[in-house]
């Protein structure tokens, strides 16, 4: 999905290079993911550094000597900061953006501590893992993800990253929401492929969806007569096209499995009402394909 999204955003998509594009775009998207997660780690480290330096001042105030530690002790931020697997991945990819460009760490931290949102959290006596996790998620969605200066920096650093940013930010929010007190370090790190078979499937799905894009575009157009095509979310179209590809060109995948999979993806990555729209279009097309005998599924019970 991510590779097709990036391919769709490209001004000059070259379908002769889709496989190479898949590998490159997947790697670049993962590097962006690591970079953004590392930003949370560095903001947390910056807060700890400020507290430590304040406590060491010759004329430290009472609040500096005994600071409110709620932010630096936030268990989700602590888990991210102590995540050795994350650090290995960053080192492997040679990513150290925020040590070189610390101004964005300072910028986001200063915006946070100046907010009522931060003040309310620090003053709250509520202390449980869910509350702390929700705070980190809200901080990310309200301060980090929409920050224009950060967006400009990422665009300048690597132009293709801004095309991937919506999907990456959404994935980070979903991953943060899965963190629990005893979660393994891998929870925050999405696995690109389960195994070699999964990698091959991703490659085949990309190639077949991209090469038949015009056919699937026409199918969507013909089955959404009351919709302004420009107002249909790009991700919704991509998800529908991928589902159509599975319907028509992957004979071993049951129709219900495909529908359920893409409804879940639409709930996770697209707009709030996307799953209703995607379900409606897919339902109409499945009925049409059954009537036209185009669902050539191999194996007993696979169509249903």
Where are these regions (language model features)?
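Class I Rossmann-like S-adenosyl-L-methionine
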Residues: 1-304
């Amino acid at each position: 999905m991510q590779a097709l999204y990036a391919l769709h955003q490209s001004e000059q998509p070259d379908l002769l290079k889709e496989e190479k594009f898949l590998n490159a775009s997947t790697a670049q998207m993962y590097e962006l993911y690591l970079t953004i997660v590392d930003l949370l780690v560095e903001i947390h480290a910056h807060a700890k550094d400020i507290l430590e330096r304040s406590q060491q001042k010759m004329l430290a105030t009472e609040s500096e000597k005994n600071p409110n530690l709620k932010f630096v002790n936030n268990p989700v931020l602590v888990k991210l900061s102590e995540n050795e697997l994350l650090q290995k991945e960053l080192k492997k990819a040679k990513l150290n953006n925020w040590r070189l460009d610390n101004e964005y760490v300072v910028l986001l931290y200063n915006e946070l501590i100046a907010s009522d949102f931060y003040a309310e959290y620090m003053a709250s006596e509520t202390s449980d893992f869910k509350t702390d996790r929700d705070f980190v998620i809200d901080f990310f969605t309200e301060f980090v993800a929409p920050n224009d200066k950060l967006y400009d920096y990422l665009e300048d650093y690597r132009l293709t990253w801004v095309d991937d940013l919506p999907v990456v930010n959404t994935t980070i929010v979903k991953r943060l929401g899965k963190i629990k007190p005893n979660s393994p370090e891998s929870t925050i790190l999405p696995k690109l492929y389960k195994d070699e078979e999964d990698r091959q499937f991703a490659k085949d799905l990309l190639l077949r969806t991209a090469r038949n894009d015009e056919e699937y575009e026409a199918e969507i157009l013909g089955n959404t007569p009351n919709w302004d095509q420009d107002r249909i979310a790009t991700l919704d179209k991509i998800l529908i096209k991928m589902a159509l590809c599975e319907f028509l060109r992957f004979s071993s995948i049951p129709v219900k499995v495909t529908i359920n999979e893409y409804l879940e993806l639409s709930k996770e990555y697209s707009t709030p009402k996307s799953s209703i729209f995607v379900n409606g279009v897919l339902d109409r097309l499945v009925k049409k394909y059954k009537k036209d005998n185009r669902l050539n599924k191999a194996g007993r019970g696979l169509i249903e």
